[in-house]
């Protein structure tokens, strides 16, 4: 595969990827495609990359991002190479998929501001444009055949990159819900549920109990 591509070609690829983003505001619950069948099928094709590292899986209505970032900061301060998968991004799509580690010539100290890359002595690396290009180009026909969503593709991209980068641990944030979320193909070493509130009621249920049931779907036996 040729690795050379222009910035314009890369941006066009991202535009096609963003077209797959569910338009909840415009379409409503009909844009939500729950289930992990596509993910399990592709995961098998790719050789189960997430089995190469330990995972902390996080779900909840509020606080997922803060908890994810604080955990990443704490783990990196112990000398671990930590993959971090969060959403949404602000400026760059690649912000969703990062690796945080401790600079070899310094001592890391956890940062309390929820930004692991700001921790003293830490190094943060975004997934490379080259990897994004190669991965999506390689699997484009499969994505189209399965009609995979934006979040499914992004999650697969993250899980594979983390394996290729040989991370020690991954902090994995759900996108929506938990039980049927694209991230729920993994078996973590720790499942974390943050605050539960009435959100996405047309997709997750109209009561706190129903929503909590969906979020708790990331909890695995003996974990």
Kindly give the residue locations of the regions a language model identified.
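Hydrophobic positions on the alpha1 helix immediately C-terminal to the Walker A/P-loop
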Residues: 66-70
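ATP-binding Walker
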Residues: 62-64
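Charged, amphipathic alpha-helical linker segments immediately N-terminal to NTP-binding catalytic cores
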Residues: 1-29
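Internal gly/pro-rich beta-alpha loop/helix module
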Residues: 189-190, 203-218, 222-223
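Hydrophobic anchor at the beta1->P-loop junction of P-loop NTPases
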Residues: 56-60
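ATP-dependent carboxylate-amine ligase catalytic core
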Residues: 5-9, 27-36, 40-52, 77-111, ...
